[in-house]
Amino acid sequence: MPDQDTKAKSTEKTADKQQGTTTRDYSDLKRLRCLLNVQSSKQQLPAINFDSAQNNMTKSEPTIRTGGHRARGQWHESTEAVELENFSINYKNERNFSKHPQHQLFQEIFTALVRNRLICREWVNRAPSIHFLRVLICLRLLMRDPCYQEILHKLGGIEDLAQYMEIVANEYLGYAEEQHCVDKLVNMTYIFQKLAAVKDQREWVTASGAHKTLVSLLGARDTTVLLGALLALASLAESSECREKISELNVVENLLMILHEYDLLSKRLTAELLRLLCAEPQIKEQVKLYEGIPILLSLLHSDHLKLLWSVIWILVQVCEDPETSVEIRIWGGIKQLLHILQGDRNFVSDRSSIGSLSSANAAGRIQQLHLSEDLSPGEIEENTVSLQAACCAALTELALNDTNAHQVVQENGVYTIAKLILPNKQSNAAQTNLLQCYAFRTLRFLFSMERNRPLFKRLFPTDLFETFIDIGHYVRDIGAYKDLVSQLNLLLEDELKQIAENIESINQKKAPLKYIGDYAVLDHLGSGAFGCVYKVRKRSGQNLLAMKEVNLHNPAFGKDKKDRDSSVKNIVSELTIIKEQLYHPNVVRYYKTFLENDRLYIVMELIEGAPLGEHFNSLKEKHHHFSEERLWKIFIQLCLALRYLHKEKRIVHRDLTPNNIMLGDKDKVTVTDFGLAKQKQESSKLTSMVGTILYSCPEVLKSEPYGEKADVWAAGCILYQMATLSPPFCSTNMLSLATKIVEAVYEPVPEGIYSEKVTDTIRRCLTPDAEARPDIVEVSSMISDVMMKYLDRLSTSQLALERKLERERRRTQRYFMEANRNAVTCHHELALLSQETFEKASLSSSSSGAASLKSELSESAELPGEGCHIPCGKEEDRVCEEVLSEDNFQLESVEKDLYSELDDELDVSDNCSSSSSSPLKESTFSILKRSFSASGRERHSQARDFIAGLGSRPRPGPQMSTFVVESASAGIAVSQRKVRQICDPIQQILIQLHKVIYITQLPPALHHDLKRRVIERFKKSLFSQQSNPCNLKSEIKKLSQGSPEPIELNFLTSDYHSLRHSRAANNWSPSDPTGSPSSFEVEEGVTYEQMQTVIEEVLEESGYYNFTTKR
């Protein structure tokens, strides 16, 4: 049995080897323990040659980077350092040290590492950098075991570790880092992440102040350090107490920068951290302040599920603020969320967690991770369902704003969301049910808006619809929708199929419902007393329009066919007049009227928005009310529309109600529904009984003649309803209602909410006597002070927009001219170069001065690249200067600028300590030759003699003597007394640029510093992709000169306006002694002079001038 004998021997050898290894490991651990227990004062450093132990000293820990290369291959390491290195190699994969056979030894080693090394100041101060790094690595490995994390706390090591991390971080962020600085920070951030992963231990971290250092490391330049800080902060932010402390620091600005500019992994971790922090109100406010909404919405184009999930939950939290909710809609966030819900995108994801990423980062394996792993279909489905639930949550919060809710419906959102309520038996039941709850909640919020309710009546069967209604308006609790989901899932297959068909019926992207004339009917928008309104599109066009269908059999048009035909004729005639005459921003445009099948169709402008009546109902259900500013904004626009109709067009609307007043974006008012409008002659009265009785004036109810003041009465009713959310005259008994209207009896507006001007205006408009009731001009005069404030804001906004448009126009023109000039210059250079060569060759063969020209020709031939490239640089500067100063481009002006620039360059060269080099001489010489070649040879030779007479040293060469003689014959004598020292303009520009860059390289501040942020944004605009060297020179030059010209606003954000307001009580600049910028100035932005002032203030605060004077 030779094989069995061989196997037995092999087994014995293996057992002996394992036994030997265990014994050796035990011996190594004991030796390390003994070394660590040696007091720092008795420790001997160094002891062994590093090269001899290099084979045993690892490269398996990639985190140990050779920050400084070994000096000539010789470097001595202490015995302890070698043992620590061996320890990190042998136990790099061990995680449960407390269950290891040598647990006691490990615990003693850990205790010694903390007591005798980490918290021993004497040892820390004298230990080599690589030695302390190895101590940190061993601590990191041991602290994978939770038992050792508690021991570290008991020994008081957390505070010392936090202090050391702060010291290293300050050196690192101050660009004075020592060896292994990055590796130390990576290991320490890992340790704090492990501590923060346990809920009860997070308080230890914040008590040590480590969270402040972690926040400052968000400005780190190395990815591993940044990721370590993000991972540790994300673990800390799981606790509400820690979140509160982190939110007190300047964290949002750096997080938004990472989300905007960094790699996918950094963005993913940052989004997760920001999601956790957004539970704090001040974090949400900072996201708004630092204009984070566009950055967050730009990330919705990503295909990574985890990144998208985190970003959407950030949006859910920040859109609780009404202004942020509106901003999300303006930036197209609603469309993007609905696009994600449609499910026609291919997503990717991965299985990594905070813990696994932290371990990979500390071990140097972070770059090897795949952030787009091939997940199973089940995992992808699970992540996608979570993402869809997040989208529904975001749309729910956005739907609290009526305009947002209307856009969701307009973008086919009800159909997209309703599809998610259908059961999906292939997915995880718990997750599918949760998604159904989120979808039902979004639909219920949309249903709360009255105009959307007819849509939902078509969706659900009666029993399910009753449960849907009983939940109530705007109920956020997701648990309230579980019974509704259970009831839906218990329906029979046929009933579910019917619901699915109902959902398909509300799809706005299906084929048109029908065609009326040349118009395709796309959707039913609403119904009124005289007909319906549809959204339509012309067969041959793309523009959306509104079409009102009026049923001519309505009794209001007459009792018999003859009366109806007469009424229709008059209405069509009046509408034709209106169509041709009305051009006002607050009055709807009419395009066409036609008859078809006993129905009158009126084609008009489609107003995006909701009727004022729906806003009343929505605010009442939310228990909110109009602010007085918003109330006046709407009423003033209504007055402007009525003044235009009454006084300029002599048109009485006759049916002015909240449902005929559309509110668009930013509460823009549009008066609609002129189907009952009547154009009257001067001083004539109308007698027909039309309109809505709730808003009808007394003279209409008494069948007396009436005029334009009937609309004033209706306007007063609408103003009253804006203040109380209820009409002034309301009763179920028609006789009682008519009596109240005739006598003008209504409940007074509650006191304390609005000013007396509101109640006075209502009282005057609701005067029962038509003769005593004011017309619309008199009403406007009553609120003249309010209208003047409104007009002032409009004028300010218009002026700011006009100036911004003018700056954009000039900048576009400047860039266009520069691009064309550069193209022309390039072609001109090539043409002149060939012409010069030809002229020189011709002159050298025919002129008596051949020797001199030969020397020049051979000199330029020595460096062909230099002779071509450098003049182009000078020419570029000349072109840029012309473009930026917006001079004309005539030849004389160009030569004048060229002489001026040449004088500056020559002055600079004379002021230098050494003589000008030949490239400068050749550059200016070549420019002169090109510039004067078009003006004549005489001028060319004069300029050449002038250059030579300045004493510029020629390039050494065989023809040098000829050129020197020529130079000497054309010299210029200048008295020494008249020579003055000049200031180098380039040096002044560099000094200013140095100041800007110095400020942006200061260590990040823990608290908000708006001045530094403004300077940082200014620096980014200087070096952005849209900038160029010419623009950089011009901007810095204006800054150094303190130009009063405003800086282009492409880099300023709302935080700068906060800075302006915070400084309103102080002097801003020498030219602004009041120091109180108006709102107009804030809109205009900052001048170079003001930016210079801010820069100098920050330099003073940072001690810049103290350092420079000592230097």
Curated annotation (Swiss-Prot):
Comp. bias (Polar residues): 47-63
Annotated active site: 655
Region listing for Disordered, in residue ranges: 1-24, 47-72
GO terms for MF: ATP binding; metal ion binding; protein serine kinase activity; protein serine/threonine kinase activity
BP GO annotations: mucociliary clearance
Enzyme Commission designation: 2.7.11.1
Cofactors demanded by this protein: Mg(2+)
Biased composition (Basic and acidic residues): 1-16
CDD domains xrefs: STKc_Nek10
Keywords of the record: ATP-binding, Coiled coil, Kinase, Magnesium, Metal-binding, Nucleotide-binding, Serine/threonine-protein kinase, Transferase
Protein kinase domain residues: 519-791
Residues holding ATP: 525-533, 548
PROSITE patterns, per the entry: PROTEIN_KINASE_ATP (PS00107), PROTEIN_KINASE_DOM (PS50011), PROTEIN_KINASE_TYR (PS00109)
Family of the protein in this entry: Belongs to the protein kinase superfamily. NEK Ser/Thr protein kinase family. NIMA subfamily.
Known function: Plays a role in the cellular response to UV irradiation. Mediates G2/M cell cycle arrest, MEK autoactivation and ERK1/2-signaling pathway activation in response to UV irradiation. In ciliated cells, it is involved in the regulation of mucociliary transport.
Protein's UniProt name: Serine/threonine-protein kinase Nek10
Native species: Mus musculus
